Amino acid sequence: MLKTNKVLFFDGIEFENIILHYIDHGKFNLAKKALSIGMDQHPKNIELMLLKTEILLFEGAFKDAEKLLVEIEILSPENEEIYVQRASIFSKKKKHKLAIALLYKALTVTENPSEINNLIGNEYLFIENFNKAKEYFIRCLNENHEDYQSLYNLLYCFEKLNQINEAKIFLKEFIDSDPYNEIAWHQLGKLYIKLNEYDKAMSAFDFSIISNESYSSAYIEKGKLLEKVDNYQEAIKNYQISFKLNSPNAFISHRIGLCHMKLGNSTLAMNFFEESIQLEPNHEQSWIDLINLLQRNNELLKSQLYVRRSLEVNGDSIELWRKSAEINFKIKFYHDVCTACEYIDSIGNHSLKTWKFWVDSMIYLKNWDSAHKIGLRASKSFPNNSSLLLRVAGCKIRLGKKKEGHNIIKETIKRKNITNQIRKKINAFFPELLNFNL
């Protein structure tokens, strides 16, 4: 009909089904065309009018939608969908209290209060009235124990209100009425961890697994808890079970890698970190832990290779750029150190360590002017750091500003905080400073 422009007569329900089919498949132009034909044949059909408001809302035409909803309310004042859609408009305009008032009206006419209670709870979340939100999510759960989104929202409210014990009491009562609810046991275990009650947490995760042996989240949380108590072998077993229940994912491979690293199994740890990266190339922490492991094994050239690869997919990772500066400094690739430090500088996220890498690289490259300028900037961020001040002094002397350099050295010596390590480093850079008996 829509392709040939041949108009056939359908009843309102048939048009509704056609329109919903197109909406569900994202074919909004066809949905609008079918709606137009349907409205021509059934101009006062409430369900078609409501579908029109839904499409108007999707397109952001709030005023037109609101106008149509007022018209529908006159025709069918007992229709809950009118109040729900009007509430949606106010919610999108961030007028959440007006949205709540309309949803209260919807409660008086609905045959499905659970859905409306959930919407009211979410509106209260928007205005951070967690006590009221909590009340409505509890209502949802009283009506439907499997409304897990309401359960998660309720626990979020308890958390924001710092009511961990109250959350624990609620979950225990919830479990009393539904003892094989794996989600509730899982959440109770997570609460026990926050309360440092690890034995009770372990039992809760075990009960979650007993309730549903294919519930992978319980194995994952149990694995994390076993890591926390240094039982890495058992943690690996639980992670491996979760692997079998779901498709492989980077998070689990990374956790198994960490366990092997703690057990001293460097090769296995590297294998799992690499597997994690293959599954999710931008999994930053897997790159970092793999690079750290290579550094600890003194495989610096290999770690540099991995840093380069990691930055190809995680180019905005400040931690990986810091790693790049550190590793390239160790292997004396000073130009690459400067590149890394320049990026770190561009986003204003320097540490004392990276400032020193940058200044020292410029010194090794004998670029005294740049080393001097960078050192001055670093000294503004760390004004009491003798190591930086002495680097600046040495650069000034190399640039022919001997008096300024000598003055900085004298002032720094007065502070009496020059360690043997600093003294050794500065004398290696600037042998002429030996005369000052730093």
Residue ranges and their predicted role:
Residues 41, 74-76, 109-110, 143-144, ...:
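Structural marker of alpha-solenoid helical repeat scaffolds
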Residues 13, 47, 81, 115, ...:
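Start-of-helix register in tetratricopeptide repeats
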